[in-house]
Amino acid sequence: GLVGAPATLSTAPIAYGGYGGYGAYGGSLLRAAPIARVASPLAYAAPVARVAAPLAYAAPYARAAVAAPVAVAKTVVADEYDPNPQYSFGYDVQDGLTGDSKNQVESRSGDVVQGSYSLVDPDGTRRTVEYTADPINGFNAVVHREPLVAKAVVAAPAIAKVHAPLAYSGGYLH
């Protein structure tokens, strides 16, 4: 192949040529570099790989077969059902310190509930509610109001205000 060398620059002395202006002696300032001839290589060598070859190959391991999960039979337990449910409860509160007075009683036999409750309203009357509930008639309540027996008001004893006599001063002299 051909290998080109870089071009070279040569300078020549400059002289005044009279009415023709300035100019250089001789030829051009730029000259081509000589062409060098280089022989092409006859063969190329492949690079040497410096990697060790594996000593042996192993087959992939065999996976164990997995069985499907075993179905477990579940027994269904039915909720207990009482065709004739029964209950009864009650309470009574009589608090002399706070004046709280209330009570309630209730009972159930099958689908029928009966009961009552009472309390003292802020105006001093006792309210009593009697109720029943069943699938045919629904919930029904009857309200009774009755005044409480007023407590006898005991008058506080009157305290007489007596002024103490003035102390004896022994008279007044002129």
UniProtKB/Swiss-Prot annotation:
Keyword hit for Translocase: no
Keywords associated with the record: Cuticle, Repeat
Cellular component terms per the entry's GO annotation: extracellular matrix; extracellular space
Sequence repeat segments: 45-48, 67-70, 155-158
GO molecular function: structural constituent of cuticle
Domain Chitin-binding type R&R: 84-150
Domain writeup: The tetrapeptide (A-A-P-[AV]) repeats found throughout the protein are also present in many proteins constituting the protective envelope of other species.
Purpose of the protein: Component of the cuticle of the larva of Tenebrio molitor.
Annotated protein name in UniProt: Larval cuticle protein A1A
Source organism per UniProt: Tenebrio molitor
Organism lineage string: Eukaryota, Metazoa, Ecdysozoa, Arthropoda, Hexapoda
